[in-house]
From Swiss-Prot:
Self-association state and partner proteins as the record states: Part of the 50S ribosomal subunit.
Protein name (record): Large ribosomal subunit protein bL21c
GO cellular component: cyanelle; mitochondrial large ribosomal subunit
Gene that encodes the chain: rpl21
Function: This protein binds to 23S rRNA.
GO BP field: translation
């Protein structure tokens, strides 16, 4: 069993572990800045009982550092209507932020 938590960040719920890298939808924070994640849904540490928030845990924060902002690989959307000569091709690249979980 390892130490892990489930957090709510940028509209997504993530299972996170210490000393690991994660990417989520863009967060408007400068690169290199440390942030405290306080929207924790569940926390499990080795040798302790699992803590479940309702909906969030109070008084607990997870420290993280912003590493970079980048674009995800391009997704191509191609729409076509048969027998109509109607074709539409669009591309989209999502803005993402990568961060490192330091400690709980």
């Amino acid at each position: 069993m390892t130490t892990y938590a489930i957090i709510d960040i940028a509209g997504k719920q993530l299972w996170v572990e210490p000393k690991r890298y994660y990417s989520v939808n863009k967060i408007n924070v400068e690169i290199g800045k440390k942030i405290a994640l306080q929207r924790i849904l569940l926390l499990s540490k080795i040798g302790e009982k699992i803590k479940i928030g309702q909906p969030f845990l109070n008084g607990i924060s997870i420290n993280a550092i912003i590493l970079r902002h980048f674009l995800a690989p391009k997704v191509i959307v191609y729409k076509m209507q048969p027998k109509k000569k109607t074709r539409r091709k669009r591309g989209h690249r999502q803005h993402l932020t990568s961060f490192l979980i330091n400690d709980f």
